[in-house]
Amino acid sequence: EIFGRYKIGSILNTMGENCPDREWMRNVMAQIQEYSIKGCGIPCIYGLDMIHGASYLAEGTLFPQEINLGATFNPIHAHNMGKTLAYETRSMDVPWVFSPVMDLGRNPVWPRQWESWGEDAYLQTVMSETEMRAIQGEDRNSIGTYNTAACIKHYLGYGVPVTGKDRTPAIIPDYE
């Protein structure tokens, strides 16, 4: 009823706890799609926040945070994380992930520094592009069977809060 009344077309879920296994999540996804098609006539796109592996799957693979992988300066690690993250997320019938974090960690006291690849724009570009291609696959016209759609997070300015505190204003000069 809620899908029809409010015309819900997408859900971003940041679960408080891990789902116990793939089958449990596949059943949840089947119910969501059933209600969505019944209420709206279209499937619901469902996404999970997965910035360092399949973190909402109890049996999922977790990788080091982006700041740690960025310290290696090796894009193969971003590729492996993206490929594994996509495969394990898709195994739960979840078609969409919120990853990678593309904000530059420019303020050292920002409490979410660990979610970024660091402060270097070139490193950020290389690692993020590599992870995105691994998540979505190489075909730009289609998401593969073992891939998911990816949505970048915190794209611009979130990592430079004036106070250093999370979710506070950023002042970004033109020269930056």
Regions found by a protein language model. Give the residues of each.
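Glycoside hydrolase catalytic-domain context in secreted enzymes
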Residues: E1-E176
